[in-house]
Amino acid sequence: MKLVDLTADLQALLASPNVHHNLSAPKLTEKVISRNEGTLTSTGAVRATTGAYTGRSPKDKFIVREQSTENQIDWGAVNQPISEEAFEKLYAKVVSYLKQRDELFVFEGFAGADEKYRLPITVVNEFAWHNLFARQLFIRPETDERDTQAQPFTILSAPHFKADPETDGTHSETFIIVSFEKRVILIGGTEYAGEMKKSIFSIMNFLLPQQDILPMHCSANVGEKGDVALFFGLSGTGKTTLSADADRKLIGDDEHGWSDSGVFNIEGGCYAKCINLSEEKEPQIFRAIRFGSVLENVVLDEKTGEADYDNSFYTENTRAAYPIEMIGNIVQPSIAGHPQAIVFLTADAFGVLPPISKLTKEQAMYHFLSGYTSKLAGTERGVTSPQTTFSTCFGSPFLPLPAHVYAEMLGHKIDEHGVQVFLVNTGWTGGGYGVGERMKLSYTRAMVKAAIEGRLNQTDMTADSIFGLRSPVHVPGVPDEVLQPENTWSDKQAYNEKALFLANEFKENFKKFSHADSIAKAGGPLV
């Protein structure tokens, strides 16, 4: 199928009389209720459930193998290839399916808060609540801002359309397929709205480096003096909690680009985890869940419509989507200067990484490529033991290009702008999980505050002999003995054994980066 034919099909679909273009949040909310797609909560938010899929489906994600991009993609388990022929057949089926719907909902907006680098996007939805999600998550145009000269990336979302693996070349009835050449994303067989968000992020992770912009899976905030801080970290490391700071304004909570001008948010909204949410712990998120926001897979009280955030009946991965303006203390537009500090967050359940370390450029590249944290997994007898988790660049599922591309860009920008980089362990101290205790949040906040305010740039440091990490000997508000993990363990031999174990885990994981020997030697464990 030629691009001109595909474009004509798409234009015909968008011109259909059953298509609603750019409905407001109130109108979309009306549609959600009248179409029985969801219910209103006691605060006026829309609540929808997603059926069998309550999270992303990475094994069902494909990139079309096309001549123009074939040699750029890092093909493998994350970026699975699918043929152009299979894509075109499935595209025709999805378009035909959507044409037969009674109603369709279209959002036309952008990804990228910096006007110089933003990407026009068109989202075509079978569900009204999905369109409300897209409207609140991406960047909404002010008046008629869309540049008609730039061809948008188009998402065709058909949750009730199911693929046939035998004839369609998919692994299951579910599919998320990206064609960079055709600028189309097909999503079918899943009602999980997060697939739309992360598909656009994957697109930006491919396009932005071509403009010498580093795409990043991180949160970002800025102080009164314009000092920008970035926070990288996998789930459970405290990224959301630590980047929400009353003394600093939020740039964005999840996806950013770093250009020659500075940092910009890729999105116009937030997609926050809701499990165990409370007004006391996270007041900004709690108060943002009101009319215009979307709750996904959250249990409601049948009589009152109140959300039960502690209930994981549908999934632990309960979510809220809302425009960033719904929380206070933000930067508008979501753009700021170059970062002064970068914080890599890890929750080390083995209790051997220092609570805070200042990294060299090579160590920063090493830990960026590693993307380490640990998770607690239950065993048959109910005992939990830590497991190492590594996610390249803290965002492995969303990286179409080889990892070294992103790491080298980071190293260059650290050099160019003199950025201070810190590794912060929000995990265990005084022993591993089951022996020690979780690092006190007040200590972590004090360390992060000192780091991003530049108060650790000239302080005395001491280096450990296993990881080669340099830690401050003193941080205001934190007991000195806590800063050196070995000192908090009563059994020094046990500490040494566990530290050597984790160092070896790092080295084993890093073997997949065959191109990065120099980084491993200069930035990895010493043993």
Curated annotation (Swiss-Prot):
GO biological process, alphabetically ordered: gluconeogenesis
Keyword Transport among record annotations: no
Cofactor: Mn(2+)
Binding site for Mn(2+): K198, H217, D254
InterPro entries: PEP_carboxykinase_ATP (IPR001272), PEP_carboxykinase_C (IPR013035), PEP_carboxykinase_N (IPR008210), PEPCK_ATP_CS (IPR015994)
A Gene Ontology cellular-component term: cytosol
Cofactor info, note text: Binds 1 Mn(2+) ion per subunit.
Pfam (any one): PEPCK_ATP
Residues the entry annotates as binding substrate: R56, Y192, K198, R319
UniProt keyword Cytoplasm present: yes
Subcellular location: Cytoplasm
Cross-referenced Gene3D superfamilies: 3.90.228.20, Phosphoenolpyruvate Carboxykinase, domain 1 (3.40.449.10), Phosphoenolpyruvate Carboxykinase, domain 2 (2.170.8.10)
Annotated catalysed reactions: oxaloacetate + ATP = phosphoenolpyruvate + ADP + CO2
Family assignment from sequence similarity: Belongs to the phosphoenolpyruvate carboxykinase (ATP) family.
NCBIfam families assigned to the protein according to its UniProt record, in alphabetical order: pckA, PRK09344.1-2, PRK09344.1-3
Function recorded in the entry: Involved in the gluconeogenesis. Catalyzes the conversion of oxaloacetate (OAA) to phosphoenolpyruvate (PEP) through direct phosphoryl transfer between the nucleoside triphosphate and OAA.
Protein's recorded name: Phosphoenolpyruvate carboxykinase (ATP)
Source organism of this protein record: Bacillus velezensis (strain DSM 23117 / BGSC 10A6 / LMG 26770 / FZB42)
